[in-house]
């Protein structure tokens, strides 16, 4: 097995390499998941001697891994590390990479592309022309794949000329989270849940992906992307699909992907006539988070410019099918919000009739909260009687399943799981090209409608939960946002 992270940046390695990829690979080493002769070859523009590269990786692990680094595992891991200088924007030098990989022709090769999406197609072509794509070769593409439907299709076509669809792994690390995987078990392994998982019992669904950090060093990249493209098109629509999809015939990747594609194609288009009623677009200004003053988005760009890129989005999405008709999915995501939290809230309908006296209190509708971060788990609010004599006093209490409390053994994080799935040739946790293109088709409708109605990003103060129009979005429907766990 050979893992080749190909970086396109001038400095050689993307932030994802340092924060996610390298720690994930090292954890696999700690768990003895690599064969003895496996190699990890990092390719970048930098002319980096091997000993300097090994020291660079060690520094990255010390910075991004909690606790001490296992000395024995590090010794094995360091032996696997190699660096190759390659400018992925150049037509030359690829034969040298072929020489570096010589002797591994019968091994699984994983090409992990951490670069601008516009380079995915040309890089795949260069790999093929240099004879690097052997029978066991797989390619990993980071999100977002493209900037819109047309660019996504072009990238998929270009990469598809070299790699079979079954060997293309479009990675979305949210799909590797244990709680996301547990959505399948929660829905389809519990007879208590599935009969209620429909419009008759569920009032609405909320999906929140909130960050308290700003764009920071990624501001230049983010200004070309925005929250709608960066978060909604992939992470949030994938979560929506897992909540809304019908039961697949099996856990085979073709069955799972097929059901998700049906959901994406059933999303009601957002048009210029509806866009102001069902979407909110915001951009953070300066404010305070955890008692510290933080700059606004335009200040972080490092130059005076009137950027209209959104850093916050709220959307009322509707799935037009029999299961979910008239049951809205409210999505919100943004940067510089009041806390870091990702969760799905399934709000059930109130009981049809209360048998309790007024002084007992009104029974609160049940609510299921599926937490993705910071503490992965599932919480179900149930109405119970407060202990004591006299009349009934009702109170909602949570039944809480916290994975960290229940399972004391460390389980692989999202990137670790996904990398091992790539090596095992298991594509169920990755996106098919039809998913990517169907998602872009819906997202493009929002972008075009924003432009048609000249709907600009409205300012919100850092450290809040986004623009106040997001509150009004639900208030118009007689609903309100649930307070996220932070």
Feature annotation, model-predicted:
Residues 1-141, 145-486:
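Secretory/organelle targeting and membrane-embedding segments
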């Amino acid at each position: 097995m050979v893992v080749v992270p190909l970086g396109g940046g001038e400095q050689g390695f993307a932030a994802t390499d340092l924060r996610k990829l390298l720690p994930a690979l090292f954890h696999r080493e700690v768990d003895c998941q690599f064969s003895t002769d496996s190699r990890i070859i990092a390719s970048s523009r930098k002319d980096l001697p091997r000993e300097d590269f090994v020291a660079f990786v060690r520094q990255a692990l010390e910075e991004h891994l909690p606790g001490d680094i296992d000395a024995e595992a590090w010794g094995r891991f360091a032996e696997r590390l190699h660096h190759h200088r390659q400018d992925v924007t150049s037509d030359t030098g690829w034969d040298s990479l072929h020489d570096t990989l010589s002797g591994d022709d019968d091994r699984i090769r994983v090409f992990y592309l951490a670069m601008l999406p516009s380079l995915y197609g040309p890089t795949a072509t260069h790999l093929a022309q240099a004879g690097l794509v052997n029978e066991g070769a797989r390619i990993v593409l980071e999100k977002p794949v493209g900037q819109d439907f047309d660019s996504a299709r072009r990238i998929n076509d270009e990469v598809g000329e070299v790699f079979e669809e079954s060997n293309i792994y479009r990675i979305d690390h949210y799909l590797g989270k244990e709680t996301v995987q547990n959505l399948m078990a929660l829905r389809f392994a519990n007879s208590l849940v599935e009969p209620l998982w429909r419009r008759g019992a569920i009032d609405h669904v909320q999906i929140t992906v909130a960050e308290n950090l700003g764009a920071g060093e990624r501001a230049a990249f983010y200004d070309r992307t925005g929250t709608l493209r960066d978060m909604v098109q992939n992470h949030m629509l994938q979560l929506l699909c897992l909540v809304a999809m019908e039961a697949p015939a099996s856990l085979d990747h073709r069955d799972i992907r097929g059901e998700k594609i049906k959901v994406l194609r059933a999303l009601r288009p957002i048009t210029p006539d509806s866009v102001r009623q069902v979407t909110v677009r915001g951009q953070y200004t300066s404010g305070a988070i955890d008692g510290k003053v933080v700059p606004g988005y335009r200040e972080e760009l490092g130059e005076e410019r009137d950027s209209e890129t959104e850093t916050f989005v709220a959307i009322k999405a509707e799935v037009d099918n029999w299961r979910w008709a008239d049951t809205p999915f409210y999505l919100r995501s943004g940067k510089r919000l009041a806390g870091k939290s990702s969760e799905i809230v399934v709000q059930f309908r109130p009981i049809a009739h209360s048998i309790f006296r007024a002084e007992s209190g009104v029974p609160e509708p049940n609510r299921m909260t599926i937490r993705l971060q910071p503490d992965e788990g599932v919480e179900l609010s149930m109405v119970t009687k407060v202990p004591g004599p006299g009349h009934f006093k009702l109170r909602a209490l949570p039944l809480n399943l916290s994975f960290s409390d229940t399972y004391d053994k460390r389980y692989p994080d999202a990137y670790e799981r996904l990398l091992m799935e790539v090596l095992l040739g298991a594509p169920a946790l990755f996106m098919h090209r039809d998913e990517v293109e169907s998602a872009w088709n819906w997202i493009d409708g929002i972008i075009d409608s924003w432009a048609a109605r000249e709907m600009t990003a409205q300012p919100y103060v850092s450290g809040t939960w986004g623009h106040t129009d997001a509150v009004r979005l639900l208030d118009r429907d007689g609903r309100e946002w649930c307070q996220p766990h932070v």
